[in-house]
């Protein structure tokens, strides 16, 4: 899914994000807004980018079809994520960053309900820093 020329650049961004998340005590970050997807993946797609503080990032794609690569999974709705993670042996995050300033209230509540973190933080403010 990620072109060879972007891999090093994106790894630097992911490592910088992980450093910030670790300092905040955050387990993972879930992004879905176009500008944040483009910044973190080099592409815009309908779906989610999941970056755990430890481990590989996941590309959770709703549309378009045809994207493939390492850690790419197709989902039809966010409720598909917990069973997918359970199948892959990925722990659900206790502390999760969501794009609070950019998602609609309903989208935010839906994602919070899907992940059921003990604590949710604001990924929007995090991404701006």
PLM segments and residue spans:
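Terminal domain-start leader segments
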Residues: 1-58, 90-92, 122, 127
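Short secondary-structure transition/capping motifs
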Residues: 6, 38, 70-74, 100
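Flexible, acidic/His-enriched mid-domain "rim/lid" segments that flank
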Residues: 8-15, 80-129
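Structural motif
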Residues: 32-34, 61-63, 98-103
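Short active-site-adjacent helix-start/loop capping segments
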Residues: 37-41, 58-60, 66-69, 105-106
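Generic alpha-helical propensity signal that fires on short helical segments
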Residues: 44-49, 55, 69, 77, ...
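Helix N-cap / beta->alpha transition motif
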Residues: 52, 62-64, 104, 119
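Compact, glycine/acidic-enriched structural inserts
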Residues: 60-87
């Amino acid at each position: 899914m990620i072109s060879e020329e972007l891999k090093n650049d994106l790894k630097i961004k992911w490592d910088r994000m992980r450093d910030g998340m670790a300092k905040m005590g955050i387990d993972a970050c879930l992004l879905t807004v176009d500008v944040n997807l483009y910044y973190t993946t080099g592409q815009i797609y309908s779906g989610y980018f999941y970056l755990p503080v430890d481990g590989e990032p996941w590309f959770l794609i709703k549309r378009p079809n045809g994207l493939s690569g390492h850690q790419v999974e197709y989902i039809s709705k966010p409720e598909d994520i917990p069973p997918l993670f359970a199948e892959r042996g990925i722990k659900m995050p206790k502390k999760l960053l969501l794009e609070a300033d950019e998602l609609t209230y309903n989208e935010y509540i839906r994602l919070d309900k899907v992940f059921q973190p003990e604590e949710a933080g604001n990924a929007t403010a995090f991404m701006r820093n």
